[in-house]
Amino acid sequence: MVPNLMVIKKHLIGLLLILCPLSLQAQPLFSVVDIQGIRENQLVGYGLVVGLSGTGDKSQTKFTSQSVKNMLSQFGVQLPANVNPKLKNVAAVAVNATLPALASKGQSLDITVSSIGDAKSLRGGTLLLTPLKGADGQIYAIAQGNLVVGGVVAQGNSGSGITINIPTAGLIPNGGIIEREVTSSFLTASTVVLNLKKPGFNTARNIEKEINELFGPDVALAQSHARIHVRAPHDPSQRVTFLAMLENLDIETGPRPARVVFNARTGTIVVGKNVKVHTAAVSHGNLTVSVMESFNVSQPNAFGRGNTAVTPETDVSIDQERGKVFIWPDSDEGTSLQTIVDAVNSLGATPNDLMAILIALDEAGALDGELVVL
């Protein structure tokens, strides 16, 4: 069956009653799913920023000069083929924007502009009219306007200078205008497809159950742990009302995965609440190798015929810290996250030490969780 407007009105009060007794772990439906056909699209273009105060691209940036010559030729200005103008006030830039879902012609977009060449700063510049294309090569928007640059660069004649933030990138608020709309099957398809942001069989089953309890049997059908098909009204106004009711529906999500995430570049470690550790003895010590090298000068006496020589002297020492041994207590459910944190702090371990300990625990089979290294 396909729900109509009368059914939606009939069950509106029932929806409010259903939402009240849900547990605190329930989340709004649209916070756990994406609607297929309602998505953002990325746009990109190539343009020129003019009006810079001598901080533009240098003469060795050939594509900037070529771009200016091509632009001038469109206005009837022809330069000799062997002439490469010096353009300190112009910079070649990449222009990008995000096209919102179901956006209409005439709406404005925020524009991001980034330098491509060797320009020092885009502060004070103006982006000339630039078409923005999608992945299919079609023009969906145009951009133009004055840049807002948060970075500052200052340099003296001696070559010394100072740079604050990033002066080679800027924004143009509402600097783009949508010229073409993206066609979507959302408004014409007989079903609405819900894609789970974090796939899970329990969550997919709960979504199917809650929607069918509200609108009737066979309205929602879970195709997999990541996709649910929902029959929706064909009339656009009824479909909007139908989705508004789905938006207010709370869903109990499945259990969160037990996961430890380690960023090797920054040393950041995030340990999920459901990570458990079983009985294990842990000892972690640091081994430090120091190599000190000094140079001695061998100077012969004044009447000798020897030569002055430089002799290196190397001193190698090894220092091994005594590592403490800690035994995590065990229980039927494993050691909690707080106990893990307290134990690591008592050992005085750094983030890298902690990651080494967790990897060793996982290899020993004492860690209930997934290790993810970024």
Curated annotation (Swiss-Prot):
It comes from the Bacteria. GO terms for molecular function: structural molecule activity. One of its GO terms (cellular component) is outer membrane-bounded periplasmic space. Pfam families: FlgI. The keyword Hydrolase does not apply. It is found in: Periplasm; Bacterial flagellum basal body. Keywords: Bacterial flagellum, Periplasm, Signal. Residues 1-26 form the signal peptide. GO terms for biological process: bacterial-type flagellum-dependent cell motility. Belongs to the FlgI family. PANTHER family: FLAGELLAR P-RING PERIPLASMIC PROTEIN FLGI (PTHR30381), FLAGELLAR P-RING PROTEIN (PTHR30381:SF0). The basal body constitutes a major portion of the flagellar organelle and consists of four rings (L,P,S, and M) mounted on a central rod. Assembles around the rod to form the L-ring and probably protects the motor/basal body from shearing forces during rotation. This is Flagellar P-ring protein 1.
